[in-house]
């Protein structure tokens, strides 16, 4: 059972949840907009309301079973506050209800029966905060000591050599190490994608779907500020702060550029010239359910099919940039086969110049030893690896 919930916070939570259950906009944006309109709520109250609405989204099927299938936001919040999702008789629930997943998603859940439910439970837990230490400015142990001196506890990441996991929810945005570019927020799984690319000093790299540029910054640092990292994205808004972030990180080798789409004519100047290309493709985001639990309710199988068509087009366009002997990494933050191995295997079948290279040995060469797997792909999830859900394939252009 959750701690006592004051009536005024219950009311705010119910109003906000009612908006979220329309599933018209991303939950985090809706929550931020609500708090801007209700600025009188203090930071602690905002945190409690936010935790409650996201808790309701994480456990929505169990709460609906407890409160009644047609229950409105008020009843769902009451069930949440009473801890109904924790005390139910699991035998009265279908497996999809136990997992708090829509039926279609549970039917496609890509883990074996012996771990499928445990993975689903792990995806319902709030995500921890991971940091990446900028190796151009600091060492992990020194950063850990400096944070500890400020009362911020961290532990070293399990896998990535520059990862730190923050204990609790301290305010970090104004910490000197964040301000001077010594640390960046980046999930440990995302950091492993940068290592899988294996960029070396002096190389020419393309981050094809760079987004806000977190992996571009990581790759630029791993190259010790040499070579060139072309950070491309279709959203100029998402790229807008990357130049300033790169400057703060001490990087002069990261070059952001907004492109029209994957077929932008300006990309042709790099055709066949790039050492390594990272494609962190737009996807369903179902590997980020710890952070974005609304995603499991806001989309269905048809959205996966649409995403797969776009992913195939992007992968094909990115492959044109890779020079013979170069590396192409295709990644998503989704566990779904339609967006992952199906896309890669169809691409390789049509492009015999590219071959899949096993991911785990490539990471092991960098001292990153993940649990062994028969798959040539990198697959991460919160149950087995304590990261977000990721898929990655490492391909080499043979000719």
Language model: regions and residue ranges:
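Class I Rossmann-like S-adenosyl-L-methionine
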Residues: 1-174
């Amino acid at each position: 059972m959750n701690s006592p919930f004051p009536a005024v916070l219950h009311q705010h939570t119910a109003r906000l949840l009612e908006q979220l259950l329309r599933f018209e906009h991303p939950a985090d944006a809706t929550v931020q907009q609500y708090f801007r309109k209700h600025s009188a709520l203090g930071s602690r109250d905002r945190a409690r309301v936010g935790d409650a609405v996201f808790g309701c989204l994480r456990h929505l099927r169990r709460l609906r079973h407890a409160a009644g299938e047609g229950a409105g936001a008020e009843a769902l919040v009451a069930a949440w506050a009473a801890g109904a999702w924790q005390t139910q008789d699991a035998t009265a629930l279908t497996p999809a209800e136990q997992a708090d997943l829509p039926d279609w998603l549970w039917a496609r859940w890509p883990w074996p029966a012996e771990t499928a439910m445990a993975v689903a439970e792990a995806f319902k837990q709030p995500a921890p905060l991971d940091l990446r230490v900028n190796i151009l400015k600091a060492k992990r142990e020194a950063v850990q000591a400096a944070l500890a001196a400020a009362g911020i506890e961290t532990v070293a990441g399990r896998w990535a050599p520059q990862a730190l996991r923050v204990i609790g929810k301290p305010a970090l945005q104004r910490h000197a190490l964040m301000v001077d570019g010594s640390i960046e927020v980046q999930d440990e799984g995302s950091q492993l994608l940068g290592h899988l690319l294996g960029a070396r000093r002096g190389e020419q790299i393309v981050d094809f779907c760079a987004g806000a540029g977190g992996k571009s910054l990581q790759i630029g640092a791993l190259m010790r500020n040499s070579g060139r990292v072309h950070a491309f994205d279709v959203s100029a808004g998402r790229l807008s702060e990357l130049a300033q972030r790169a400057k703060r990180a001490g990087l002069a080798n990261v070059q952001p550029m907004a492109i029209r789409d994957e077929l932008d004519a300006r990309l042709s100047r790099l055709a066949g010239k790039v050492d390594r290309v990272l494609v962190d493709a737009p996807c369903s985001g179902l590997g980020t359910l710890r952070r974005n639990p609304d995603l499991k309710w806001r989309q269905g199988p048809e959205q996966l099919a649409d995403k797969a068509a776009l992913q195939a087009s992007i992968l094909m366009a990115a492959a044109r940039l890779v020079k013979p002997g170069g590396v192409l990494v295709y990644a998503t933050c989704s566990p779904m086969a339609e967006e992952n191995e199906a896309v890669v295997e169809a691409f390789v079948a049509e492009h015999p110049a590219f071959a899949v290279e096993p991911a785990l040995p490539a990471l092991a060469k960098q001292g990153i030893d993940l649990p062994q797997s028969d798959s040539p792909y990198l697959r991460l999830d919160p149950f087995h690896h304590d990261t977000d859900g990721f898929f990655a394939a490492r391909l080499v252009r043979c000719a």
